[in-house]
Amino acid sequence: MNRFFKIVLTSTRRASTNGSGKRKTPFEGDKVHIPDEPYNSKVRFFICFKKKLKHGIQIDESLLSEMPPIDAKLISHLERLSLVRFDSEQAVANLRNSIRMAKRLELVDVEDVEPMHTVWESQECPTFDDVEEEPLPIDKVFRNAAVRFDDFFVTPPGNVPLESNERFDLNVINKWDTIGKPVAPEAKTIRLAEGRRK
């Protein structure tokens, strides 16, 4: 039997003589290892996090710095850096909402708080020696190449600029979080298609 379960079993007893299905209570003076009622650790963490804000649990939106406007140049720059394409206005609106939520961290007082660290900062991580084992023959290596030229890999060109025409209605997206709607506006292509039908 697991040592943890032995500790729990020895520190609890049945509330009645029958005890079938009844709540277990610890003996007097015993340390409780398991809480009587489950609690949501995420909610508890969120409350503790909010208590560290300068202005309590309620966040004063006027203290936040101004939201940067999202334009076509910024979208293409983010797409090039992240290699992720925004496929709809909802994706751009979600990005704007994430920026807005991240700006609340500016109000967190981190004075006298040590930065987080990982266990790897104080532990050694041994790696294998870089010793060549059995080299693969060239024909097996070239199986991974879709296109070849004079026994060289041909890679697709990188950082190709995407189309510069505006795919989204950015005026509506920049007003989206101030309107207070839970979802982003309809896609520009859908609105244009419906306008043609009329």
Swiss-Prot record:
Does the UniProt entry include the keyword Mitochondrion? yes
State its role. Allows the formation of correctly charged Gln-tRNA(Gln) through the transamidation of misacylated Glu-tRNA(Gln) in the mitochondria. The reaction takes place in the presence of glutamine and ATP through an activated gamma-phospho-Glu-tRNA(Gln).
- Name of protein: Glutamyl-tRNA(Gln) amidotransferase subunit C, mitochondrial
Which reaction does this chain catalyze?
Answer: L-glutamyl-tRNA(Gln) + L-glutamine + ATP + H2O = L-glutaminyl-tRNA(Gln) + L-glutamate + ADP + phosphate + H(+)
Cell location: Mitochondrion
User: What Enzyme Commission number(s) appear in the record?
Assistant: 6.3.5.-
Q: Lineage, please?
A: Eukaryota, Metazoa, Ecdysozoa, Nematoda, Chromadorea
Pfam families assigned: GatC
The UniProt record's further free-text remark is: This protein may be expected to contain an N-terminal transit peptide but none has been predicted.
Task: Determine the domain of life of the protein's source.
Answer: Eukaryota
* Cystine bridges: none
Q: Which GO terms describe its biological process?
A: glutaminyl-tRNAGln biosynthesis via transamidation; mitochondrial translation; regulation of translational fidelity
